[in-house]
């Protein structure tokens, strides 16, 4: 769910997920997808594509288990297949955001989404 996603983002980046990524550029948080503008935005684009492949559960609402072990996200073994997939999507975006912190630009924290160019396909 968005709760676990937010925790993972905070654990990996040290940033408040809602404040820093909730409206970041074209693909992070709410709103329509657009052509990714920077590496951080591309992480979010790939995450939305990952969610599109999930069937059988609601990635934004359904809770799953994971743990934080030795500064690493470990998806719970007892999660059903669908939620295991959601956990892996969320883990991947959290790691991607950490790996691309150097491209994060505070001035893009709030972006008017209609200015985004047409989206790429997944």
UniProtKB/Swiss-Prot annotation:
Q: Where is this site: Cationic membrane-docking site (MDoS)?
A: 112-113
Entry comment describing in which tissues the protein is expressed? Expressed by the venom gland.
For region Important for membrane-damaging activities in eukaryotes and bacteria, the annotated ranges are 106-117
What are the BP-aspect GO terms?
arachidonate secretion; lipid catabolic process; phospholipid metabolic process
Q: Where is this site: Important residue of the cationic membrane-docking site (MDoS)?
A: 106, 109
**SMART domains found in the cross-reference section:** PA2c (SM00085)
In Swiss-Prot or TrEMBL terms, this protein is called Basic phospholipase A2 homolog
